[in-house]
Each structure stands twice: as C-alpha cells, then as structure tokens.
Amino acid sequence: MRDRFLRACRRQPVDRTPIWLMRQAGRYMPEYRAIRERYGFLQMVKTPEVAAEVTLQPVQAFGVDAAIIFADILPPLEGLGLQLTYEKGEGPVIHNPIRSPHDVSVLRSCDPRETVAYTLAALQLVKRELNGLPLIGFSGAPFTLASYAIEGGGSREYRLTKRFMYEQPAAWHDLMERLSRLVADYLIAQIEAGADAVQIFDSWAGALSPADYRAYVLRHTQALVQTIRARLGDVTPPIIYFGTDMAGLAGEVRQIGADVLGVDWRIDLDVAWAQYGFNHAVQGNLDPMTLFAPPSIIAARARDILERAGGRPGHIFNLGHGILTETPVDHVRYLVEFVQSYPLPATAPVLQEVV
C-alpha cells in the first residue's frame, strides 16, 4: 500500500500509520554531508539533479511513506526582487528587507514557473523515481515569508514584523495579499509538476496572539487555500498546514481550510486533534530531541503518540519540527521501523471534540 500517506491525509483507513519526517533529508545523513561538501546550500536547492538526489536519500535509507522535495521556503521571494543569501553561521539574510509601504509597492510581480523553475524540475525528476510513493511539495506561508522579508532574516522577537503590522496595516495587508497569490501560484505549479500533496509551513505564526492572527493573518492564509481549491477543483491534492507553538491558535487554525493540520510536541496529540476537529487529519508530533534518547525512550514516546491517535483514520506520524543536525541516523531508522511495525487497534477510540 504505497498510498498510505495520501489515504491518511483524506482520513481513509490504512493498514498501519504512515510516517515521514520533516527535514528528513539533511545534515544528519552522511550521504547529504558528502554532497554538501561540494555545493553551497542555495546551489543544492537550485540544481535540480542535486535536489532530486537529496530528496531520494531518506526514501532509500529508511523506507519512509512519503518523499518531500528538497527545497527552501525563501527562494520564491527572489522573484519579488528581494536579495537572498545564506551566510555561514547566520542563516538566511535578505539584504533589502521591507521596511516601508514604498518597499511593498515596488515588489515585482512574478511567475514561480519561471523564477523557481529549478524546484519544479526537481519535482519532475523525483517523481520518475518514486514508483508511486507520494511526493510532497511545500512553501512558506504568507505570514512567515512576510516576517523573513521584514526582519531581513531570522528573529526571536519579531519586533519589526509586529510593528509593521500595527503601524502600517494597509501596507501589511497589501504585502500579505501579494504573498498569498505568490504561494498559491507556487504550490499549484508544484502540483502540476508532480506533487501529490503540499505543505504550508507557518514556522513563526506561533509568535502571534489569537487576536492578531485573526486580524492580520487568517484571511490571507484562507485565501491561499481557497485559491488552490478554486483553480484545481476536484483534483486538489491534500493540503497540510504546519506551524510551531500553535496550541493557543487552534480555533483560528481550524478555519484555514487545510485537510491536515500539523501538531508540535508541546501539546498531546489527542488534545490537539479534539481542538482542531475530527474533520481534519493530523500530523505529528514527536519532539525532535527525542531522537537523541536511547531507543527505549524513543519507543515509549512514539507508542504514546500512536496510542493517543488510537487508530482513528487520519493520523500521519511525524516530528513536531525538523530533524536536528546531529541526530543519530540509527535512531531515525529505529523510529521509522517502530512506527511501521506498530499494530493499529481493531477499533478507533471515541474522542470528544472540542467545540
């Protein structure tokens, strides 16, 4: 059953819980490090043959139930005119950040089929090698992309982003509308290139209060999902939405319109599922640090998550964030094998949904 992941996204019965892992292709793998010695990070992302090879590494090494394209959330911003580099020890840097309404007004229109064509080519290459195993495309969400564009890189306080929201609301919503259109176009292009599902990463949205998420973000994320569904109709593949520290935003997140909602490790899976509603599938939610623990602890934590899911159709096992750089490869393999061998209960539990 090579479609377990897609069936779980649609809350259909499966013979076992599917598993894939965010950042499953990464520095913890020696195969990845060997390639990284020869290429810069952006060079890897922008070279379709290399991105395809890296995408396939964890599929070949661990037998995960889905591949996710090797890419990054920020390169689509280059099409708008933002200048992006990755600095050693510093991460991504945007050299002309957005700081004024004028900066928003001069952003270019772009077609991701041209500006991010390398990722679409990589998707096509990977698709040919998967023999029916699902392939996941992805993008950053409008809020997270806006935050990077305004902060000029990573941030802990999001001070510039929040000030821009509060002080320049018209320019903020203009920016978010532009990014919503960009992300919709990009994800549709990925689907047309072969993606069987798409994930929207809202890595920083957990920094917002529910009131601010409703006022400044929700409608733009909804518009993104609605645009994909309107343009693709009945052939729209599963849409996954993921962010960290989102437990306080459950009432808002359940309104986005995604098929699958990602859950991080800061909340029990059954509690999150009840809050999100059982009309959604859920994905998660092992703490990535658990993979540094002995196998007995990995098994105990994974078993707890699987028992909380209880065999209810619609659970995809994943981490609550990406795999960390120094993670032992054998522990990743152990986790995948444990989840794939864990028997589903005969009947799903009766859980009370939070209204």
From Swiss-Prot:
Family per UniProt?
Belongs to the uroporphyrinogen decarboxylase family.
Q: What is this protein called?
A: Uroporphyrinogen decarboxylase
What EC number(s) has UniProt assigned to this enzyme? 4.1.1.37
Keyword DNA damage among UniProt keywords:
no
Q: Which gene encodes it?
A: hemE
Annotated keywords: Cytoplasm, Decarboxylase, Lyase, Porphyrin biosynthesis
Subcellular localization(s) per the UniProt record: Cytoplasm
Please indicate which residues carry the site annotation Transition state stabilizer.
D72
The species is Chloroflexus aurantiacus (strain ATCC 29366 / DSM 635 / J-10-fl)
